[in-house]
Amino acid sequence: MSMKKENTLDYSKITATLMETFNYKSVMQVPKVEKVVINMGVGDAIFNVKVLDDVVEELKLLSGQSPVITKAKKAISNFKLREGMPIGAKVTLRGARKEAFLCKLTRLVFPRVRDFRGISGKSFDGRGNYALGLKEQIVFPEINIDKVKKIRGMDIIIVTTAKNNTQAKKLLELYGMPFKN
């Protein structure tokens, strides 16, 4: 008898269910989650670059790897933004870190979100990718509320190999994503 870790999913069941649902001929046709991108944009970084240090540290805590600082692609004078200014940070998770993050998201983070009734089923891009936003970073168990200087939101993009939204939605449902009806 083998002991199974609490934070893992049974991919053979997910694959079997998807093959049965969509009548795939080969296992290679079954959609998979390719990567998860976590992005935190910080508008305050225009005036105070030190704010980015907090964001980088928080992303490092919740993802387990070092984030990349994102820079402005073009200048916008109304926001006093110049091209190349640091305005946020992002992390791309693949492999075991991606799986652990998705598991943590569905089992720990969503239950801690205030007034949570499920995630929207309309946030697919038409090509099987899903985007969602969280309003506060303190819902993650790694973030210490006492050390947070300002509550910030984040974007989480789940990139799949699915060809359309229905395949991607079924895949994410099998991963444990709680969609609204």
Curated annotation (Swiss-Prot):
**A GO-annotated cellular component:** ribosome
Q: Which Pfam families is this protein grouped with?
A: Ribosomal_L5, Ribosomal_L5_C
Query: Could you state one GO biological process linked to this protein?
Result: translation
Q: What cystine pairs are annotated?
A: none
Q: Give one GO term, molecular function aspect.
A: structural constituent of ribosome
Keyword field? Ribonucleoprotein, Ribosomal protein, RNA-binding, rRNA-binding, tRNA-binding
Member of which family?
Belongs to the universal ribosomal protein uL5 family.
What is said about its interaction partners and assembly? Part of the 50S ribosomal subunit; part of the 5S rRNA/L5/L18/L25 subcomplex. Contacts the 5S rRNA and the P site tRNA. Forms a bridge to the 30S subunit in the 70S ribosome.
Reported function: This is one of the proteins that bind and probably mediate the attachment of the 5S RNA into the large ribosomal subunit, where it forms part of the central protuberance. In the 70S ribosome it contacts protein S13 of the 30S subunit (bridge B1b), connecting the 2 subunits; this bridge is implicated in subunit movement. Contacts the P site tRNA; the 5S rRNA and some of its associated proteins might help stabilize positioning of ribosome-bound tRNAs.
Q: Under what name is this protein listed?
A: Large ribosomal subunit protein uL5
Q: Which organism is it from?
A: Onion yellows phytoplasma (strain OY-M)
The organism's taxonomy opens as: Bacteria, Bacillati, Mycoplasmatota, Mollicutes, Acholeplasmatales
